[in-house]
């Protein structure tokens, strides 16, 4: 039985993984409450609201009941809570595929090496690009199979910045990188055309869950 302090949980739900190299898989999600970064195109602002205190054992009971092929810990910003590291390790002990989605502002060096980390890189339109944690790039270059980076693009200016940024940090062509359009702001066709024009070796994604369900729905 876990003796760690409870974590503050926004929601636990079962849905389709929508925005990573694991997109399309049924997935159990644990969304932790709290963030505070203020990204302009955040689509989970409700995760800033007070959550429910749950122990790791309680979380595990809920998650394992879904019998999902993968589990994702997300937020908010999950790494703001110190108990997240213990939760990730506990999930890895019981589940073969554990994902972490983080905003990319905090180092991931304390994350259990069995976890596959999906790390955001914030572009200029986010309003918070100065908080990107460059230390994560060094870690990913040493163990590229454990990490992928995701950049949400709102304009061609964002796209050109992102292309230069990932090349400048040495991760282009060496780490898995995903570009996606800001839902409702950038036409996906434009992003696809820019990538094809530039022969850019990155993956394009759409937020799959927003095309399946109401884009503003929670728990999907």
From Swiss-Prot:
Mg(2+) binds at residue 44. Residues 22-215 form the Radical SAM core domain. Its cofactor is [4Fe-4S] cluster; S-adenosyl-L-methionine; Mg(2+). Its EC number is 4.3.99.3. It catalyses: 6-carboxy-5,6,7,8-tetrahydropterin + H(+) = 7-carboxy-7-deazaguanine + NH4(+). [4Fe-4S] cluster binds at residues 35, 39, 42. GO terms for biological process: queuosine biosynthetic process. Binds 1 [4Fe-4S] cluster. The cluster is coordinated with 3 cysteines and an exchangeable S-adenosyl-L-methionine. GO terms for molecular function: 4 iron, 4 sulfur cluster binding; carbon-nitrogen lyase activity; magnesium ion binding; S-adenosyl-L-methionine binding. The keyword Ribosomal protein does not apply. CDD domains: Radical_SAM. It holds the Pfam family Radical_SAM. It comes from the Bacteria. HAMAP family: QueE. Homodimer. Belongs to the radical SAM superfamily. 7-carboxy-7-deazaguanine synthase family. This is 7-carboxy-7-deazaguanine synthase. It comes from Chlorobaculum tepidum (strain ATCC 49652 / DSM 12025 / NBRC 103806 / TLS). The gene is queE.
